[in-house]
Each structure stands twice: as C-alpha cells, then as structure tokens.
Amino acid sequence: MEQTWRWYGPNDPVSLADVRQAGATGVVTALHHIPNGEVWSVEEILKRKAIVEDAGLVWSVVESVPIHEDIKTHTGNYEQWIANYQQTLRNLAQCGIRTVCYNFMPVLDWTRTDLEYVLPDGSKALRFDQIEFAAFELHILKRPGAEADYTEEEIAQAAVRFATMSDEDKARLTRNIIAGLPGAEEGYTLDQFRKHLELYKDIDKAKLRENFAVFLKAIIPVAEEVGVRMAVHPDDPPRPILGLPRIVSTIEDMQWMVDTVNSMANGFTMCTGSYGVRADNDLVDMIKQFGPRIYFTHLRSTMREDNPKTFHEAAHLNGDVDMYEVVKAIVEEEHRRKAEGKEDLIPMRPDHGHQMLDDLKKKTNPGYSAIGRLKGLAEVRGVELAIQRAFFSR
C-alpha cells in the first residue's frame, strides 16, 4: 500500500515535515479555500502541488472535490456546478493528479456527537452517541416527524439526557453536529440547518439515487477520458440520519453504482471506519467483490456499544474491524493487479487517530492529531509488512 496522510493545507497544525517524519510518502489534500462548486484552476492546483513536492512528498489523492448541494437536490444551477466539476477533473488530470475521493452525503458530511470522548487510557476519541443525537434532533432541532426514527426506549432516554444537559452541553452538542468537522465544506447555524433539511423533504432514497445517477453519468465519462479515478467515500455513519437518505452505505449500494455507470473510472474509497459501523457490512467481502475498483483506503476501526447505533473510534488494531483480514485482502488485490502488469499501489491513510500524549495539550483538528495517526500508520505498516513477508515474499 502507498502510505499517505491527510493534510488540510498551510493552516494545518500538522506540518508536511511532520508528515514526512511519520513515514508517509503521499499527501491527501484539497483546495479548501475554493468555494464549493467553483472550478479549481490549474494555477491553484499547481501551487498546492509545488508546496507538497517541495517537502519531498507527492500529492497522491484529492480529498475531496466537494459536490454542490444543488447537484444533490437537482435544483438551482446544478448543470453549471456539474460543468465546473468536469473542468476541475480535467485540470487535476492536466496537473498529474488522478485519484479523487468524494462523497454524496446530503447536507452533512461525517457526523459525531462527542469530539473528546475520554478512553480508559486517558486518550481522547470521537464518538457518535445515538441517545445524544436523538436529544439534539428531538429537543434542540425539533425536527417534525423525528420520533418515527427512534424506538420508544430511545425517545425516553433522549428526554432524560436532554433534561440533564447544561446550556453549554446543548451548545457543544449542536456545534459538534452542525458546525462542520474537518473536511466538511459546509457549516450551519441552527436556522440555516433547518432550511437545508427542508430542501430534502421530498427527496427519498430513490430520488437521491436518481440525482446521483445524473451526476455519475455526467462526471464518469469525463474522468475516464482524462484518466482520473473517482473513489466515492461511504456515508458516515452509514445509515439515514435527520430524515435524510443515505445511498453509499452497503454492498448493495456499491453494486447499484457499478450497475448505474459501469466504468472503471467509477470506483470506491474503502473506509473501514465508515462501512464497519454496520455489523451487516462484511468488509473483506466488499474488498474481494469490488477490489479492482478500490482506488483509496481509509483504515481505522470503530467499536459498537450497548446501543448498536452508538459507536466510538477505537484504536486502529482494536474494535470491530478485523484490520489483519482487511489489510490482507487489500494486499492480495495489489498483487492481483501486479500480475496483470499494473504497478500502482493503493493509497492508504490511517484515518483518524486518538488525541494522545503531547497532542492532549494542543489545539488539533478533531480526529486528525499527529501522534494518534502516527501510531495508527505504524501499526498498519507493521501488519502489512508481516502479511507481505508471510504470504508474498520469494
């Protein structure tokens, strides 16, 4: 696997020098300063590429080229935003950057309720608490019809939880959910958030798939023409939330994408921490079935709790994800490609890490502190080395 590291640009508290010392050779980054929907110019792409290469690294993957909400709702200037997206892909290809991670999650990107969940060893992790999320949706957001998405027990527990929250607790929970986590390109006030949710009131799973198909049928031929590999990131968490449909959550969703636009440019990001939240997702089977289309991997693990919809981010080699079997399946896919004469490795990044050691004293991007990811990268690197030596060395 190609060892990569997500970097949020010049304002990231983790420097490119840090990235290189961590042992990564590739950088995963994006032009976050360009508004959603606008074209990434060749000039801006080359500026970022030069910064990365001057540090002795390569820009391996774009994560992400965000998709404008008009495209997801099939309203407004969606045709112009699609045309802009096509041009951005052409410009990236011209600059030699040919792997693009993206997602089609409506309104929100990845979602957590607690950004400082303290683990038994004193390090901090990200957590999604189903009851806290219900408390937000039922008692802070007050979304009409939200009760239908929860069990009677969850509704009762959410009422108790809300009653014990201080004003600061409520404000923190609201910020965590709607203000935008690292990599998310949108942040909202509560009123703005309600208005954006309203735009989806008539969009169910079938309709969102229809809108996604319009996007894919416009984008994938351009990607194929210029040699760009599109790698869709799964929903996080991989299930409907806030009354919003989610359409990249299961192996059935992956098959739908392939059936909709059957091009090798139409591929996947295997994010084990997102897909792995669902007990019914067999990660190894997903890799084996769609291996030739996996162009990027995010390797991390989560741990489901007593309420199976509640989870926290576990250490990379712990939790519900069998990281050994996952890495073995990825390495097997790389060797299959090599047998076909393809030499490209699959970029992997240690997705998220615990806030630990000296980073506990620093301001860090949630999930993206240096030391936790350094630990995760080293652990995954060790797993891969053992697999390569045991099964593939001659």
From Swiss-Prot:
InterPro entries: Man_deHydtase (IPR004628), Xyl_isomerase-like_sf (IPR036237). It catalyses: D-mannonate = 2-dehydro-3-deoxy-D-gluconate + H2O. GO terms for molecular function: ferrous iron binding; manganese ion binding; mannonate dehydratase activity. It comes from the Bacteria. Its cofactor is Fe(2+); Mn(2+). Its EC number is 4.2.1.8. Keywords: Iron, Lyase, Manganese. Pathway: Carbohydrate metabolism; pentose and glucuronate interconversion. Transmembrane segments: none annotated. One of its GO terms (biological process) is D-glucuronate catabolic process. Signal peptide: none annotated. Belongs to the mannonate dehydratase family. Catalyzes the dehydration of D-mannonate. HAMAP family: UxuA. PANTHER family: MANNONATE DEHYDRATASE (PTHR30387:SF2). This is Mannonate dehydratase. It comes from Escherichia coli O81 (strain ED1a).
